[in-house]
Structures are given as C-alpha cells and as structure tokens.
Amino acid sequence: MTASPRPAEFSPADLAPIVGALRAAGCVFAEEEARLLASSARTPADLTALVTRRVAGLPLEQVLGWAEFCGQRIAVDPGVFVPRRRTEYLARVAIMLGWQAARPGEPVVVLDLCCGTAAVGAAVAAALDHAELHAADVDPAAVRCARRNVAAADGQVYEGDLYDPLPGTLRGRVDVLAANVPYIPAGEIALLPPEARLHEPRVALDGGADGLDLLRRVAAAAPQWLAPGGSLLSEVSERQAAAARRAVAASGLGTRVTSSSDMDATVIVGTRYGTLHR
C-alpha cells in the first residue's frame, strides 16, 4: 500500500508573504488562515494554489475543503453553503431535544431539513447514543457533500424540495426536525459579504421578502412529520423572532424562543402536543 503524501513543512519565513497577501485581501485572521492553508498543502505549488483561491475571495472553508462544527470536521465542497459558527447553537438545542426524546432500545429519529452539508444532523447524531438520521436539500452539490458527512452515522440524504423527497415512512415519526432554512430577506442579499454573495448558492441564503418564506412552508407541514412530543427548530435573526414564532404557532405547534448572546444566535422551537409513544 502506498502511503499518502505528507503535508509539506513551511517555515515562518515561508508564510510571511502569504500572511501579507491574505491581509491585503481583507482576511482579518491572516496568520491563522496562513497556517491552516499551509497545513492542507502537500507541496509549495499546492499552497500557492490554495492562497490564490482564498485571495480571489472564496470562503476559507471551501478552499480547505472542510469546516469545524461542534468539534467535527465537516466536508465543504466549492459552491456549497458553509456552516456558520452560530448554527452550533441550533445543533446544541437539537441535541438537548434528542436526549429528551430518547427511549430505551429505540432510535431518536432526526431530520435535518435544508441540510446543506448536513453539519447539524451529523453533530446531533454523533451526540446521541442511538439516532436514525435523515437529511434533505434541494441543491445537488449540497446533497453530495452531505452524504459524505453523514456516512459515519449511516444517515440517509435525499435530494428535493423540503419534504417532497422524504419517504412516507417518516411521517409522524420525527423526534427532532432541525430546519436550517435560509432567512435573509431577499432585499438584503446584495449587502452580504462577497464570500457569501458570490460563492454560496442563493437558494441557501434567500428567505423571501421578509426572510421567513421557507420557515412558513416548513412549519405548515411539520405536524404531519413530527412524532407526538417531537419538535421543529429553526435558526432566525433576533429581529425576526416574533414573526417567526407566529409562523410556527400558526401550524398548531407549541412555540418558544431560545437564544445565545455569546453566539449571536436565535432559535425558534415548535413542539407537537402529545405524549411520545411508539
């Protein structure tokens, strides 16, 4: 068996011009980025290619091919939505709900909707003793990436619009439905940093006129898919919280808002009334 090439070793002097180039391109954490890029390069030519892509404006995670999320290394392909650090809070809330739903000898059924890389689903499944993981996204590139990220959990990933591609056997069985829907108002897309605006799919960013179009669609059908006692949870901005809560409540779910000031994250939780029985 042929051993994989080892990363090249670069001295501080080698990295100095790279730090300068990254800083000139507007990278705030240029030193850290230079170290990460160097650790991913097999040869000096590789490093040059990586730096060129980063300086051109590609998100660091797409250049590296991975992002750290909840302590896991999540594969991120070019053109795929990059999991945000604030979304770790959504994953943590989902994990807590998964623990509460756990029953001896039975899996916690987890659905990661609008999954992107499936970072949330992968993190939740990794934290639970026994999870049955499903994920779905409309973007084919995201689906390919997600399948790699959930392989360790034996997760299933489906391609299609929201619930459309899901197997009917999931209806009424989902304990934790994490929907990381796009929630940026359409009129604010142009204000996003170029990294997101130019290199991530608009379908993963654009939430319609007020940013809540997708959440309304997800919430409207959620009761059909949730198990009794199961919960839908979704990330929104703080200023959208009241309207988002009304949208989820309109589907008949009991609602609450939870937030983390440290992570600048707001999550809407909607729970299907009833006792969890299987």
Regions of interest found by a model, annotated:
Residues 2, 28-97:
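Conserved AdoMet
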Residues 181-214:
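Mobile active-site "lid"/loop adjacent to the S-adenosyl-L-methionine
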Residues 37, 57, 87, 120, ...:
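Residue-level signal for inorganic ion chemistry
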Residues 89-191:
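Conserved SAM/SAH cofactor-binding pocket of Class I
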Residues 209-272:
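Conserved Class I SAM-dependent methyltransferase catalytic core
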